[in-house]
């Protein structure tokens, strides 16, 4: 679209100019129809495009989580993923994708760790840049996030991140710096938190770094409800407050202008940037209505992506791949029939479909007898009862139950979990409303059923008009719904199979709750989760699983975490698997260790006290729509695993360098590990990990020549050398290997990590094939942040280039030199 920005600015009213600086609703910018300025739509999330609705949304493609994407170490593949993200945005009528997330998972406990890419800033930045390039090739703008330091969820709006300038530059800002240099996305989202005493959204120092030092000029938008002031945020450089209606702009900007606390030129500058964003975004050929686009080629890409993200952690005695001639196989675990396709929070969406491991194994082994047992549940809340519920409908009112009420809206329901943060209806009071959900529930098994109701608001559950759960006055804050919900309140009732019961929930919106919380984001209308299951005997479930494993030729035990354990809004309190899972795994290994493969699904590391006893361990992350197919493709050898860990896997959470400095204490968190994040710390102090950064096995074998050959012996930042080694597939099947280039400065007088990743390449080789692999060093390979000079410094001297297949498996070495010490700023 042709938008004459100068003309608009010269003909626009002051009121409309200021209105441009905030959204009009949850997802849209302010339009000016008389000057042909359209409204621009943005949308979540990090692993799929939800569209404009958390509640009753249009289905979408669900991609593997961020750590899964990074574990491919495949920039070309992530470019394809970015294109798919862009196309999904267009189908949802969205011009701007709120992603990717490139914060640093300094601790395995971070609630959004699964959204991020890697503990290493080079890997995170490179993978994000590829994804952004793909997305923006479709015309959709990427809003990379969260700038910067939103590395925990605890009190994320209030916490003050205390971090040295060196760590800030070398670790936490570096991914954004790489993205700015290699992709230059059109938008940047600020974080909720403070950095060294100042909210980022109000920090002129931080935002000037982007525009002045880096010469990158994106639209800078706030995170949702992450604007806290009028004057400071305007003067710092925040262009767009989201969402709308505005809380800190509008008439407050007018008042500040009259008091000369904000200059008119500042308003013009912010409005110009918003109009530039509108001009760029409006060129995208978006759909007029939100639609789906579930195409075969997208399914194939998603399946390939899931399989290539899987990391083979352990394969003792080559237990994998499993033969397809198995006569009897046991499938054990909570994730076998209910795959964990994504984490929670902004990553949540309604998927087009899901493929379970049970379905995928049934397809792969059509003539094999399958023994299925849950063994132990992995859910935090009782599972939803969607498949047992019919005729469900929700009615909305402004008045509470028991009073004379006028129906304001009706919504057909297919789920017993809902979030109403962006729900709206004519004449419905969004600040305070009530709803009644009714439906027919037909249990499939007779016995005592446990019901659980979790709310952000208030709720009463009735079964055939009998009150079963009261979650109204005696509420305890839990972790659900971005950290704002209650813990689950429970009740029980004896039910008969195949008999239909009337389910009714009397719900009150968020403001009916007596709970108040500091540091969490308060989104709109609230939420609820109704779950139920037959009251179970945990010991009997384990015994049944052990019996199946003992009888089977092989056992696949698939379990782990899910969106209830890893989510935006809260952090994990420990690194353990859900209660009962370790005991289940140990019991199965007691009878079938030599024929059992453990498949773990989580977005970040979990403790594995049984790891030394397991012959096969597979890390399957949150795999998206094609989770089951991806896992089965690897387990049965249709895909040779090539994934590599983007995170170090500690034995115990206490070994993590952030263990003593995680979560907000007294309103602040100290990044005491400084630049020694992840493998940088473990290597520096000699701490053993369960699996190192970059680790991942294959069904084939490779050899790598021992000497690194350089395109030039002298390193110059303006023309970094290329490192080369020979690599050969010495096995019997085709496979891909990731060669990782680490740089070491052993003679530097400045304390530095033992080595740091500064390049990588993924090489696919046929059996017997040999090739020379070239890895171009990063411009930043030899530098560190000099806090005295306030600049990057590359010291004169001899450096080592180390190439390996993990941070601990170095196979080739070489040396190069920097001929003189240099200082610099910028990209």
From Swiss-Prot:
It catalyses: Hydrolysis of terminal, non-reducing beta-D-glucosyl residues with release of beta-D-glucose. Pfam families: Fn3-like, Glyco_hydro_3, Glyco_hydro_3_C, PA14. One of its GO terms (cellular component) is extracellular region. Pathway: Glycan metabolism; cellulose degradation. Signal peptide: none annotated. GO terms for biological process: cellulose catabolic process. Residues 387-546 form the PA14 domain. This is Probable beta-glucosidase H. It comes from Aspergillus flavus (strain ATCC 200026 / FGSC A1120 / IAM 13836 / NRRL 3357 / JCM 12722 / SRRC 167). Belongs to the glycosyl hydrolase 3 family. Beta-glucosidases are one of a number of cellulolytic enzymes involved in the degradation of cellulosic biomass. Catalyzes the last step releasing glucose from the inhibitory cellobiose.
